[in-house]
Amino acid sequence: MARKVWVCDRCGLWHYDKPDGCKACGVLATFQFFHSEGEAKRWARLLMLVRAGEVRNVRRQVTFPLMTIGPKGPIEWAKLVADFTYDEKDGDDWVPIVEDYKAVAGMSPDAALKIRCLEAQGVRVRVMTAKGEV
């Protein structure tokens, strides 16, 4: 089971229980919630890449509708919430990236189906683990 993490926006301290306030700052603060330590580490890495100029427009928990064709046109049957989206530098161009972080243990059949369906809609999904891209 993944360990949930709340990261203080002010000082960056990690909290493993839902905090009322930050233990380091001593004040009420806002927190970023992550479903796992690995996802929080990936977010920190993406922020470093932003500072280095390698990526831009980083966003978290972006929702993509999963569509199918019904008798009266397109129907949304589910949603995929991607962990991160960003633009990655590729020479002189910027390439949009949709990324989902998964534990090394693998992904659920439900998640695999949603990723395949989004890719069928023309959106490539980069699946990352602690060991790198899958």
Give residue ranges: language-model regions.
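Electrostatic, structured charged patches in enzyme active sites and in nucleic-acid/phosphate-binding
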Residues: 1-134
